[in-house]
Amino acid sequence: MLNTTSMAMPRELTTTQKAARGVLFQCLQKMEIGCLTVIESFKTETTERSERFSTPNGDYNSEPVAATIEVKHPGFYSRLLQGGSIAAGEAYMDGWWDSPDLTALMKLMALNLRALDKLEEQGSWLTKLLYKFSHWSNRNSEENSRKNIHAHYDLGNNLYEAFLDTNMLYSSALYNNADDSLEQAQINKMDRLCQQLELKPTDHVVEIGTGWGAMAIYMAEQYGCQVTTTTISEEQHAYAEQKIKERGLENRITLLKEDYRNLTGTYDKLVSIEMIEAVGKQFLPSYIKVCESLLKSGGLMAIQAITIADQRYDYYSNNVDFIQKYIFPGGFLPSVTSLTQATTKYSDLVTRDLFDIGLDYAKTLNEWHLRFNRAESEVRSFGYDDRFVRMWRYYLSYCEGGFLARTISAVHMTFQRP
């Protein structure tokens, strides 16, 4: 049973707002882990109302889990009830609520998804239907893929330069040592994938998802490989093209602007870093078939993928979240089991290695968030407004909290074509 304590009564809410608050608080009483304090500060009086929801099991992995949310707008409760977790993100973007530690709050919520699922069930069926239709309309057909990639990766290279490492890697790093810098951890990540591929100078590697060119350049310079790499992002293509020329690697690296479905030829090795999330559930079979077709017999394939917990996969597959609506339109996280089952069903690829780097991703996101905050004035100078800045803070904390709670993770998976 949860204990709730109340201070002074708030300004009178409307009947609808009171009812919505009551539903939310009932759901919060079903929390199983941690402690949440809800503070209402939207009233004109000097007094505040505070509700504290605490569970007998306040720890996670022997560490206390506690967070605070400050509600700044009386319409927050009904908005949340109507639109669920997506509306929570939208309300944050609009400044309707805040938290002194947003990541701690996201972690606490991720640890109590069963309680929050009950809240989602209370939402408007029409709103849910509209979310699903919007997500379906963004499915990653060849035409839509370009639009979806453009929506996130073509925001401007200067935005990403403000918070990424010097090599511009927008994917999880690998912290071999606790004191590794972000730059070193990103090199660790690239080198581990190269080791998994058993790269040698005679290899011709195909990379699906160039990013800003760091992995292709690393493989060419450090392992002497021939690399063919593709991206459908205009901004990334232009940036990678310039970097390849600056390094004098035009004879080693072939840079394409092709959808993965249009790639031809056969290669010794294949690498793809956090591109599979942009494939979509519907197109996962074709992605796997294409990857297999690009590999020579005996060829190795290494991917880095963000994954949803197996236990959440069915629920996630049938719903739409904040990231899919605002950050990565058309995005979809596979689970480890769904990936292995799909490769078994749609190819002859054999799984050779599985390596989890979920907590490394949490640390990577934390570093990105710190850098993003330090660069806030620079980001605003690019023309991004307060709502955009808050959206990105929410996105970074939302993801870090999920990785810390293990509801999402990231893996290196290595496959081989017989």
Report residues per predicted region.
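Conserved SAM-binding loop of SAM-dependent methyltransferases across substrates and taxa
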Residues: 212-223
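Substrate-binding/catalytic lobe of Class I Rossmann-like enzymes that use SAM or dcSAM, i.e.
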Residues: 307-418
